[in-house]
Curated annotation (Swiss-Prot):
The keyword Transferase applies. Belongs to the thymidylate kinase family. It comes from the Bacteria. It holds the Pfam family Thymidylate_kin. The gene is tmk. Phosphorylation of dTMP to form dTDP in both de novo and salvage pathways of dTTP synthesis. The lineage of its organism: Bacteria, Pseudomonadati, Pseudomonadota, Alphaproteobacteria, Rickettsiales. One of its GO terms (cellular component) is cytosol. This is Thymidylate kinase. One of its GO terms (molecular function) is dTMP kinase activity. Its EC number is 2.7.4.9. It comes from Anaplasma phagocytophilum (strain HZ). Keywords: ATP-binding, Kinase, Nucleotide biosynthesis, Nucleotide-binding, Transferase. SUPFAM superfamilies: P-loop containing nucleoside triphosphate hydrolases. GO terms for biological process: dTDP biosynthetic process; dTTP biosynthetic process; dUDP biosynthetic process. It catalyses: dTMP + ATP = dTDP + ADP.
C-alpha cells in the first residue's frame, strides 16, 4: 500500500508520516514498512535536496525546478518505492505527486495537464491513500520558518493551499483533508489526535489490502 502525506510547509505532515511509520512498524514489523520523503529518499536525492535548500536565495526557473523535482521523484520511485510495493510492503511518503501539482501547478502557474502527464510518465501510479493536512497559512509559516524552510510570499502559499484543497475535493476516492482547526487544543493542533484519526481511517483499508496481498502469494 502506498500512503502519502501532503500540505503546505509547516503543516505537520512530516510529524504525521513519522508517527504512522512507527505505528505500522509496530503492527506489521519494520521490514514491512518503508518511510521516504520528497525531495529525498535516496543518497543521490538527499544530496540534491541539500544543494537545493542551501541556495534558497537563488531563483530557479520554474520549469527547471519542475524537472528537478520530477527527476528526483523518478529516482526515488525506481530505487525505493517500486520495489517495496512489489514486495507488498507499506510505503509512506512525506510528499509526492500532489505537492508538484499544488506548488508548481497552482502556486507557480505551470499547466496542470502537463504536470499530470509528466507525473504519469515518471511513476505510472498514484498513491492508494493521501492525507492532506490543511492549516492556517500564518500558523504553518511560523513553524516552517523555525524549521529552516525557504520562505515564499503569502500569495504564493494561498494559491498552494487552495491547490491542495482542490485536489482533495476532486480526488475524494483517495484523498482525505484533515483540517488542523478540528484538532486544536488551546490554539495548538494536537498531533496525536490527528494521528489517531489517520489510524482509524486506515484500519479497514489496510486490513483489506493486506488480506489481498496475502491471498496473492503462491505456496
Amino acid at each position: 500500500m502506498f500512503i502519502t502525506f501532503e500540505g503546505i510547509d509547516g503543516c505537520g505532515k512530516t510529524t504525521q508520516s513519522i508517527l504512522l511509520a512507527k505505528y505500522m512498524s509496530d503492527l506489521y514489523g519494520e521490514d514491512n514498512v518503508v518511510l521516504t520523503r520528497e525531495p529525498g529518499g535516496t543518497s543521490f536525492n538527499e544530496l540534491l535536496r541539500s544543494v537545493f535548500l542551501s541556495v534558497s536565495d537563488y531563483k530557479v526557473d520554474k520549469l527547471t525546478e519542475l524537472f528537478l523535482f520530477l527527476a528526483m521523484r523518478r529516482e526515488s520511485f525506481v530505487k525505493v518505492v517500486e520495489s517495496a510495493l512489489r514486495a507488498n510492503k507499506i510505503v509512506i511518503s512525506d510528499r509526492c505527486v500532489d505537492s508538484t501539482v499544488a506548488y508548481q501547478g497552482y502556486g507557480c502557474g505551470i499547466d496542470l495537464d502537463l504536470i499530470y502527464k509528466l507525473n504519469s510518465l515518471v511513476m505510472g501510479i498514484v498513491p492508494d491513500m493521501t492525507f492532506i493536512i490543511d492549516i492556517d497559512i500564518e500558523k504553518a509559516l511560523s513553524r516552517a520558518t523555525r524549521n529552516g524552510y525557504e520562505s515564499n510570499s503569502m500569495d504564493f502559499y494561498h494559491k498552494v493551499r487552495k491547490g491542495f484543497q482542490r485536489i482533495a475535493e476532486e480526488e475524494k476516492h483517495r484523498c482525505v483533508l484533515l483540517r488542523c482547526d478540528d484538532y486544536e487544543e488551546n490554539g495548538i493542533c494536537d498531533v496525536y489526535s490527528v494521528h489517531n484519526k489517520i489510524v482509524g481511517l486506515l484500519q479497514g483499508v489496510l486490513h483489506n489490502k493486506m488480506d489481498a496481498a496475502s491471498s496473492s502469494v503462491k505456496v
